[in-house]
């Protein structure tokens, strides 16, 4: 009898990676991806095998460290939240040009509805323009199985593979059947290193190879066990359901969907399966979490007169994460009976914790800033961002990791005085140091406060 475990989506992916012969995981923490690395760190197999686990300085360094392990023939995993892909983009996009040696899987955990993020960007776009195959599990079992398939795919085509999770997938639990444990790869090196040296002449050759391979990736997607066409008698509408959206569809049709369904969990989008559905159905409904990536692609594949519905046409909300109820409404089904929610506790808005050192920083900072009519305070990403809320109202901006120092510098260049930056220890080592170099180089008239709370809170501690 197969062993079964109750796992978060993050944990299922992490366990699948360990069982696939993982040698190293490199990550920068961020909701909803953090639990992947934490699970690997605490698993007995990690200690038994000596799997390398690292919280890197930022997502770019994590990507590069994993690429180095892949160069040496070992299987490596990179984990980050969706906005971390912006930081890792230079290394990620160019890793498609170098290719991989040992299996290399990059996990991006998206945050629709921005539960803990600045935006709800969709990481599938990175897979598209980097020409990297992308996997998107629809449930926890697939998260476990798929990461193992992703490592195999990476080594088959010598290419990094992107895996996309979403908040609900990452942070919900299900029973997962687990399989045997694969041995780690032995250390080995590429037969030739020309493609690893991205000089223009080498890159032009490699890019043509990558374009040829991308066509093969689509063929693989059309034949993948993770993409499935299920026929049904009512062909008035065909449904394309991507990733966790397929779970929501199944929840609304527990006895089977009466319409044809194309489940998509591996990209590039297989045009042949889309054309088959279009030829058999009167219209298409596209259900996907995040931005209308597949909906836009389908409109490019199919002739204009076909009725295509989804997030772009209002059948599904344009923003925010999907729910079984929003999918139910798009399917034209009557809503479930509901009951008024009980008011068990009074809502508690976010606030800096009692006793947190950041409170003292903001209390002192507010007193000083109140003495200067034009004082501006530029904050950064971390729990200290909560200084914007009552009772402090102490900051004016929070944009992205490291922006506090550079925005304060730019404001000072424009004549703002005093111009104050507030940044945490982790964010300073992530991307604040380069901005400080600019400020020092130009002798900028700014004040930089590095608020080191000596512990792991929203991000992680830096020594």
Model region roles, listed by residue range:
Residues 1-140, 168, 232, 258, ...:
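Thiamine diphosphate
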Residues 2-10, 20, 137-352, 357-358:
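Flexible, low-complexity linker and terminal segments
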Residues 79-80, 105-109, 162-166, 240-241, ...:
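Short beta-strand segments
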Residues 418-431:
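DG-centered beta-turn motif at the end of beta-strands
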Residues 435-450:
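A short alpha/beta connector and helix-capping loop motif
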Residues 460-463:
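Conserved small/polar residues in nucleotide/adenosyl-binding loops
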